[in-house]
From Swiss-Prot:
<dbReference type="GO" id="GO:0005886">
    <property type="term" value="C:plasma membrane"/>
</dbReference>
<feature type="topological domain" description="Cytoplasmic">
    <location>
        <begin position="270"/>
        <end position="279"/>
    </location>
</feature>
<feature type="transmembrane region" description="Helical">
    <location>
        <begin position="302"/>
        <end position="322"/>
    </location>
</feature>
<dbReference type="GO" id="GO:0016020">
    <property type="term" value="C:membrane"/>
</dbReference>
<dbReference type="InterPro" id="IPR045621">
    <property type="entry name" value="BPD_transp_1_N"/>
</dbReference>
<feature type="topological domain" description="Periplasmic">
    <location>
        <begin position="126"/>
        <end position="135"/>
    </location>
</feature>
<dbReference type="Pfam" id="PF19300">
    <property type="entry name" value="BPD_transp_1_N"/>
</dbReference>
<keyword id="KW-0571">Peptide transport</keyword>
<comment type="similarity">
    <text>Belongs to the binding-protein-dependent transport system permease family. OppBC subfamily.</text>
</comment>
<feature type="topological domain" description="Periplasmic">
    <location>
        <position position="301"/>
    </location>
</feature>
<keyword id="KW-0813">Transport</keyword>
<keyword id="KW-1133">Transmembrane helix</keyword>
<dbReference type="InterPro" id="IPR035906">
    <property type="entry name" value="MetI-like_sf"/>
</dbReference>
<feature type="topological domain" description="Cytoplasmic">
    <location>
        <begin position="323"/>
        <end position="340"/>
    </location>
</feature>
<comment type="function">
    <text>Part of the ABC transporter complex DdpABCDF, which is probably involved in D,D-dipeptide transport. Probably responsible for the translocation of the substrate across the membrane.</text>
</comment>
<feature type="transmembrane region" description="Helical">
    <location>
        <begin position="200"/>
        <end position="220"/>
    </location>
</feature>
<feature type="transmembrane region" description="Helical">
    <location>
        <begin position="136"/>
        <end position="156"/>
    </location>
</feature>
Length: 340
């Protein structure tokens, strides 16, 4: 298979996944008990007012008509209008998405900076105390609820030690940096505001660490497995026989080859972090898409919920597409193997 045929195949898969998410999200959102028009009008509103709001929102029409209108607007780049705020969903996502993306990138960076060295050491010291510790860490990370871990680190680092802030993106007395990218760290650097940069960095540490903990152990175990496979290859034995230092063999020979199969796991981790940010943002009062969609669900804001699902699923599939193409570029044998 050629590069373009694989790209075409993956793009079709992207379209099918996003279409499936649209259908499933639409069905589930309309199965949730409750009346958005009643919530918007208030408990004391008359039935006539509620019915008028329902007509304005198009909720009085059959479901297939509502779905057709939604898909038609989606093809024109319109995710609808939020029932709760009255603003376009796309406009609200542009406000909240950068905060979620900054948190996800921060968590991924922490997972890589800690997980890769742990995986290397775990492979080099196989079946020793560090190897067992990494295994326990991976199991604990997968089984620990994010909200429980988040509350725990807030109590420890903010409540008892008082060395890190417990929520938000900035202290209340600081003004956000001028909006350029929506990433406070990057915008503060572009503005040359060191005070805002370090304050935003302090606020990012706890939620990013909480979100990264689940994937930290997974990254470490993946690197360990790939490193063990590489360390048993003949070229490693040849390098050792030639008298090269052990650390040089591990870092310059085994590690680059071990990172190739790990690219897929790292790409999937970024997609998972976008979904996993929902609970983490709620716990840390992080003003991103997670906290926004939780409020939208409570208000039965169907357009906002469906817009969130479409954007996040599209980002998830797009990340996988980039990972597949990157993997193909690094190792062209995959494309040749797919065509045989």
């Amino acid at each position: 298979m050629t590069f373009w045929s694989i790209l075409r195949q993956r793009c079709w898969g992207l379209v099918l996944v996003v279409a499936g998410v649209c259908v499933i999200t639409f069905i589930i959102s309309h199965l949730i008990p409750g009346d958005p028009a009643r919530l918007l009008a208030g408990d004391r509103a008359s039935d006539a007012i509620v019915e008028n709001i329902r007509q304005q929102l198009g909720l009085d029409q059959p479901l297939y008509v509502q779905f057709y209108r939604y898909v038609s607007d989606l093809f024109h780049g319109d995710l609808g209008t939020s029932i709760r705020t009255g603003r376009p969903v796309l406009e609200e996502l542009r406000i909240f998405f950068p905060a979620t993306l900054e948190l996800a990138f921060g968590a991924l960076l922490l997972a890589l900076l800690i997980g890769i060295p742990l995986g290397i050491l775990s492979a080099v010291w196989r079946n020793r105390w560090l190897d067992h510790l990494v295994r326990i860490m991976a199991i604990t990370g997968i089984s620990t609820p994010a909200f429980w871990l988040g509350l725990g680190v807030i109590v420890l680092f903010y409540g008892h030690l008082q060395i890190l802030p417990g929520g938000g993106r900035l202290d209340d007395w600081l003004d956000p940096p001028t909006h350029v990218t929506g990433f406070y760290l990057l915008d503060a650097l572009l503005e040359g505001n060191g005070e805002v940069f370090f304050n935003a960095l302090q606020h990012l540490i706890l939620p990013a660490l909480t979100l990264a903990f689940v994937h930290l152990g997974i990254v470490a175990r993946q690197i360990r497995s790939a490193m063990l496979e590489q360390l048993s290859e003949d070229y490693i034995r040849t390098a050792r026989a030639s008298g090269l230092p052990g650390w040089y063999i591990v870092l310059c020979y085994a590690l680059p080859n071990a990172l190739i199969p790990s690219i897929t796991v790292l790409g999937l981790a970024l997609g998972d972090l976008l979904y996993g940010a929902v609970l983490t943002e709620t716990v840390f009062a992080w003003p991103g898409m997670g906290a926004w969609v939780v409020t939208s669900i409570q208000a039965l804001d169907f357009p906002a919920v469906m817009g969130f699902a479409v954007v996040v699923s599209f980002a998830y599939v797009l990340v996988n597409l980039v990972v597949d193409l990157l993997y193909l570029w690094i190792d062209p044998r995959i494309g040749r193997g797919g065509g045989e």
